[in-house]
C-alpha cells in the first residue's frame, strides 16, 4: 500500500511460508540513525519548538514530559498511510531514518513493525497526531484515490475481503472529511509505550 500511495516508506517485506514458527513475514533490515530520531519523548524544554507535540505527564521532579515528532513531510505521508491502514501501534521507535540500499545509501524515513494494521474495527493509535484536523493536500487526495483503485487481486492472500473493504472505506471517508483524522476519544490515542 505504501508503494501504491507513492511514498515507499515500508522496507521490502516478503511472505515466508516455512519460517521456524510457521508462516509469517520478513522485512529488510534498516540501520537507524539513533542520534537523530524523528519522534522523541523528553522534558518539554529539550524538545524542538517547531515540532508537533503534546504533554505526556510530569516526572518525579515535576518537570513536564512531552512527546513530539518532526514536521518532516515523510511523517505526514506516514500519518496518512497509518490512518488508511488503521495502524494500532505506530510508536516512535517504528519510525527510522536510515540508508536506502536501493538508492546508494541515501538516507530516508522508514516505517517498520507494521504488524497491527488492516483491522476492520477502528483502532488507530499513533504518535503522529501533529496533523490532526489539517486539510488534505491535493497530492494526498491523489494517494487516497490510488488506494480506492487498487484491484482486489493485488490484496489477494494478504488480507481478507472485509479488510480490503475497510481500507477503501477509510480512504473514502478521509476524502469526504477532507482532513487528517484526530483522536476519537473512544479509545486510547497513543500506543504504549509511545517510543
Spans of model-derived segments:
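Conserved ATP-binding subdomain of kinase catalytic cores across diverse folds
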Residues: 1-52, 58, 80-88, 99, ...
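Alpha-helical scaffolds flanking conserved acidic
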Residues: 72-77, 108
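Short, glycine/acidic-enriched loop or turn micro-motifs at the edges of active sites
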Residues: 85, 92, 116-117
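Glycine/charged-rich beta-loop-alpha catalytic/anionic-binding loops adjacent to active sites
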Residues: 59-63
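Hydrophobic residue at the +6 position relative to the catalytic HRD Asp in the kinase catalytic loop
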Residues: 93-97
Amino acid at each position: 500500500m505504501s508503494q501504491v500511495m507513492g511514498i515507499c516508506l515500508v522496507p521490502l517485506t516478503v511472505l515466508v511460508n516455512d519460517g521456524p514458527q510457521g508462516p509469517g513475514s520478513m522485512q529488510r533490515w534498516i540501520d537507524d540513525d539513533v542520534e537523530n530520531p524523528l519522534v522523541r519523548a523528553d522534558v518539554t524544554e529539550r524538545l524542538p519548538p517547531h515540532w508537533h507535540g503534546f504533554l505526556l505527564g510530569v516526572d518525579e521532579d515535576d518537570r513536564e514530559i512531552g512527546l513530539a515528532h518532526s514536521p518532516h513531510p515523510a511523517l505526514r505521508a506516514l500519518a496518512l498511510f497509518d490512518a488508511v491502514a488503521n495502524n494500532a501501534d505506530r510508536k516512535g521507535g517504528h519510525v527510522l531514518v536510515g540508508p536506502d540500499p536501493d538508492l546508494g545509501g541515501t538516507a530516508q524515513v522508514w516505517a517498520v513493525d507494521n504488524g497491527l494494521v488492516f483491522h476492520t474495527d477502528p483502532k488507530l493509535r499513533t504518535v503522529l497526531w501533529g496533523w490532526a484536523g489539517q486539510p488534505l493536500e491535493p497530492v494526498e487526495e491523489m494517494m487516497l484515490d490510488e488506494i480506492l483503485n487498487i484491484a482486489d487481486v493485488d490484496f489477494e492472500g494478504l488480507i481478507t475481503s472485509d479488510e480490503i473493504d475497510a481500507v477503501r472505506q477509510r480512504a473514502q471517508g478521509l476524502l469526504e472529511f477532507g482532513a487528517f483524522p484526530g483522536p476519537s476519544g473512544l479509545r486510547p490515542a497513543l500506543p504504549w509505550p509511545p517510543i
